[in-house]
């Protein structure tokens, strides 16, 4: 799929080492962030403010690079190729930890419950069944 505003992955992708072909990315469906149930991805993680996230990741805060990234994210397919950034290596690397909870403890002994969009609860329950 070609880059551009119609691309399902949006205008920018943040790749990181993992064994699951998962990455963080922009989206062309911004309305999903206003929904209560946002588990609409196919495994990757959509970012609501990808440009702000890119700026956060830049250790040196190089203004020219930020301008090029912004241009790359907003330009159409006829863009000035000299101003488009294709890859930026984040240095130093930023650790990324992804957790998946369907139940989460809240203050006061309450529990927040979330949809099990990946179906992991049944797998875990089957593994723990003999101990219950």
Question: Predicted segment positions?
Answer:
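Well-ordered beta-sheet/strand-loop patches within structured domains
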Residues: 1-132
């Amino acid at each position: 799929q070609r880059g551009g505003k119609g691309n399902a992955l949006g205008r920018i992708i943040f790749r990181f080492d993992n064994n699951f072909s998962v990455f963080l990315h922009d989206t062309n469906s911004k309305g999903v962030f206003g929904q209560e149930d946002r588990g609409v991805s196919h495994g990757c993680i959509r970012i609501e403010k990808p440009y702000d996230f890119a700026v956060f990741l830049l250790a040196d805060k190089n203004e020219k690079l930020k301008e090029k990234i912004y241009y790359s994210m907003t330009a159409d397919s006829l863009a000035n190729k000299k101003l488009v950034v294709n890859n930026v290596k984040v240095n130093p690397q930023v650790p990324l930890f992804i957790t998946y909870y369907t139940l989460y403890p809240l203050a006061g002994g309450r529990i927040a419950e979330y949809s099990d969009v990946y179906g992991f609860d049944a797998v875990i329950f089957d593994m723990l069944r003999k101990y219950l």
